[in-house]
Amino acid sequence: MDLLPHLRQAHDHIDRHYARPLGLDELARVAGVSKYHFARSFEAAYGLTPIRYLTRRRVERAQDLLRHANLTVTEICFLVGFSSLGSFSSLFNRLVGESPTAYRDRWAARGGPHVPGCYLFMRGPGQLGADQANWG
C-alpha cells in the first residue's frame, strides 16, 4: 500500500481543521491506518510529528492574524485552536522567538493593513488570505 496519499489526506485535514481539537486517533482514522503507524509514518514523511505539525500550523495562522487582523492576542489564541493563552504564548515564543504581542508590535510599526475583527468573526480566519488577494 502506498502510504503517502493517505498521509497527505491527514496533512490536508490538519490544514483545513487546525482551529478545532484534533488528536492522533482522528488523524489516523483520516489516513486509514493505526495510530502508531500513522505517527511514525507522518514524521518520516514530513519531518514533524502530526501534533508538532498541527502546533506549527496554528502558530503560522496566528502570525497571519497578528499581522493583519484587529483582534486581541487572546481572541487569536482561541481562533487558531489553542485552549490556553499561556500555552499559546509560550509555544509562540519558542517557535517564533518573540511573544505574540512583540510580534504584532513589530509588524504594526511597518504600517501593515488590519482587517476589522468583526469581519473575521463573520467570515472566519481561514478566509483572510483569499479575501486580501481580491482587495488588491
Residue ranges and their predicted role:
Residues 1-35, 44, 49, 61-136:
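Alpha-helical bundle regulatory/interaction domains
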Residues 52, 56:
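Short, basic-rich loop-to-helix N-cap that marks the start of a DNA-contacting helix
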